């Protein structure tokens, strides 16, 4: 009989330094809490440092809080400049789902800038300091995505919140594919994996301020609270990547139907998310946009 996975599988992580982006709520908070409990030194990379300090005190253990706004490339560079010691594990967890099309201070479509281009630049800048593992939180939303390499910022095609989110997560999947390919080709000791946390109720953003949208949001929340993973369950696929001897480049999701909830398990991805030519083009695009290079 196979016992269900639990965070106790992490063992003793004392001496390990881990960066978790988006650590103040949702999956990032659940991830940080479990890692700190296992003895790791967790750096909470967050937009709101006041809330970050509050979360750090709640989490206990060995933690530090640092400012990071992934929608601002100057903030990404400033954060990377603060990291002067080796990092064992980098967890690119933070993400955005916006109500309308807006742009970052760098002129990127907000969803793409936060979910792909910020983490991409951060990883490139920190790569010389990473010793062991990079985990990128993707999503099964990639299964419904259309990839427009020539219009990833949705300047010419119609923008929709779910379309932009799905495309950004497909882009993360492709980046992860190419990152894994390069690390293995170089014989690097660093491994990388992708995860899908399931449907986590606390990560759902507001759907707008209109009465109709508020009503829709309440309906979604009511269903989500019944069907979704909680934040600890949502963190499990990420933690599973750390505790289990899974192959480099794996995609870890959840056991339940439709990828909604359940325990961590290795899952498949769409053919497009396995397209190495598309992945190489995606990485070249991200390098041009961020002015950083994936040097493996």
Q: Over which residues does each language-model region extend?
A:
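Pocket-edge positions in alpha/beta enzyme catalytic cores
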Residues: 44, 68, 226, 271-274
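Alpha-helical packing segments of well-folded alpha/beta enzyme cores
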Residues: 55, 175, 234-237, 282, ...
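Polar helix-capping/helix-linker motif
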Residues: 72, 151, 243-244, 275
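A short C-terminal helix-loop "cap" of Rossmann-like NAD(P)-dependent dehydrogenase/epimerase domains
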Residues: 155, 211-222
């Amino acid at each position: 009989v196979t016992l269900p996975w639990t965070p106790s599988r992490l063992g003793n992580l004392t001496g390990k330094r881990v960066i978790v982006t988006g650590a103040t709520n949702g999956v990032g908070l659940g991830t940080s809490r479990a890692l700190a409990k296992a003895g790791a030194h967790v750096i909470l990379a967050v937009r709101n440092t006041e809330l970050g300090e509050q979360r750090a005190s709640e989490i206990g253990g060995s933690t530090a809080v640092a400012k990071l706004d992934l929608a601002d490339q100057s903030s990404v560079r400033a954060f990377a400049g603060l990291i002067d010691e080796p990092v064992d594990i980098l967890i690119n967890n933070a993400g955005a789902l916006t109500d309308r099309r807006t742009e970052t201070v760098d002129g990127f479509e907000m969803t793409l800038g936060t979910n792909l281009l910020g983490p991409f630049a951060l990883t490139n800048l920190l790569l010389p300091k990473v010793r062991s593992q990079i985990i990128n939180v993707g999503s099964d939303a990639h299964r419904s995505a259309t990839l427009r390499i020539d219009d990833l910022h949705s300047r010419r095609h119609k923008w929709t919140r779910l379309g932009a989110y799905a495309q950004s997560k497909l882009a993360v999947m492709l980046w992860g594919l190419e990152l894994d390919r390069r690390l293995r080709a170089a014989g690097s000791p660093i491994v990388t994996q992708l995860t899908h946390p399931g449907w986590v109720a606390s990560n759902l953003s507001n759907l707008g301020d209109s009465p109709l949208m508020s009503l829709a949001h309440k309906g979604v929340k009511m269903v989500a609270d019944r069907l979704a993973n909680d934040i600890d369950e949502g963190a499990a696929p990420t933690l599973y990547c750390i505790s289990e001897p899974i192959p480099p480049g794996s995609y870890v999701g959840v056991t339940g139907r439709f990828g909604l909830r359940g325990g961590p398990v290795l899952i498949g991805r769409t053919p497009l998310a396995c397209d190495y030519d598309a992945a190489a083009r995606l990485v070249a695009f991200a390098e041009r946009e961020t002015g950083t290079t994936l040097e493996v």
